[in-house]
Amino acid sequence: TISWHGCGSLRLAYSEDEMDWLRQTLSVGSALGFNIELVGTDQIARLHPFYNLDGVLGALYTPDDGHVDPSNVAMALAAGARQLGATIVRRCRATSIRPAADAGWAICTEQGDITCEHVVNAGGTYARQMGEWTGHVLPMTSMTHHYLVTETVPQFEDLKDELPVIRDDQQVSGYIRMEQKKCLIGIYEKTNPNTVWEDHCPWDAENELFTTDYDRIMPWLENTFERMPILAGLGISREVHGAISHPPDGNPLIGPAPGRRNYWCCCGTQIGIGWGPGLTRELARWMVHGSADV
C-alpha cells in the first residue's frame, strides 16, 4: 500500500495575473487529458468550508490530485524494480565516479567497484558534489523547508470526506491539508529563504533535520491562522525543518550532462514526490530510445 489520499486540490488565485496563470495551466492540463477545472469562490467554499476566501478570485480544482506517503511510494517502487530484475544495495556510499577503459563508467563504492554503461546522478542534496567527481558544475543549492502538524482539529472529527489540499502561494507560501484528523501546514519561505551546506552536504548526514525557525516562518503562519481560523487556538504536535535541493530557475536538472558520454542527471527536483514518476519515466525513454516523449 502507498497510503494514497485522493482528496483533490485547490490552487488559489488573488489577482488577475494569477488567474491568467491558472487559465494557462488549465489549457495545458486539459490538452494533456487531466481532470481539471477553474472554479469560483462559491464552489471553493463548498469544497472547503473552513477556508477564509477574502480576496480570492478563483482556484484551479484538480479532483484527482491528493497526497501520498513518500516512504511508502519509495518502497513500492523498489519492490517493483526488484521484480523486474534490478538490484538495490543499501548502506553503500559511492566515493567516486570515473570513466572506465571500455567507454563506460566505474563507480567506486564502500563495498567495491561497479562498472556500467550508463550512470545517473540522482544524488539529491549530494548531487552537486557528486558532479564534481566528473568535472560537472551543477547549479543547485539546498534550501530549507518547514512543515508543521497541529493537534487534532475538532471540526475535522465528523467529516466524512477528506478536505482538498489548499495550495495558497500568496498568503501561506505553501500548502495546507488534513493529516488524519490534524492539519499539516507546509511553508516554503519564498521572501526570506534559508540555505544550508553552501560548500558540501556532510557525507554522514542522514535524515538531517534542523531546529524550527519560528521567527522566519511566523508571518506565513499568522497568515495561515487568518485563512483557517479553526487552527488558531491549536498547539503544534510535530515540527519538521529539512533541506531540499533547488536549481536557480526552479526546474529540475534532467538529461545528458555535457561533455560526458552516457552521464545523465536527474537532480534538483525540488518537488520530488510530484515530479519523480514522470521525470524518471521520460529519462528512461531518453536513455533507451535517444529522446523523451515530451
What is the predicted role of each segment?
Residues 1-47, 171-176, 180-184:
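Dinucleotide-binding Rossmann-like beta1-alpha1 core, especially the glycine-rich loop
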Residues 2-11, 45-84, 199-208, 261-268:
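Helix-loop-beta segment of a Rossmann-like dinucleotide-binding subdomain
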Residues 5-9, 143-145, 239:
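Short Gly/Ser/Thr- and Asp/Glu-enriched loop/turn motifs at secondary-structure junctions
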Residues 6, 40-41, 90-92, 109, ...:
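Short loop/edge segments at beta-strand edges and connector loops
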Residues 17, 48-56, 98-106, 246-250, ...:
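A short, glycine/Asx- and small/polar-enriched loop/turn
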Residues 60-118, 126, 277:
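Helical element adjacent to the flavin cofactor pocket in flavoenzyme catalytic cores
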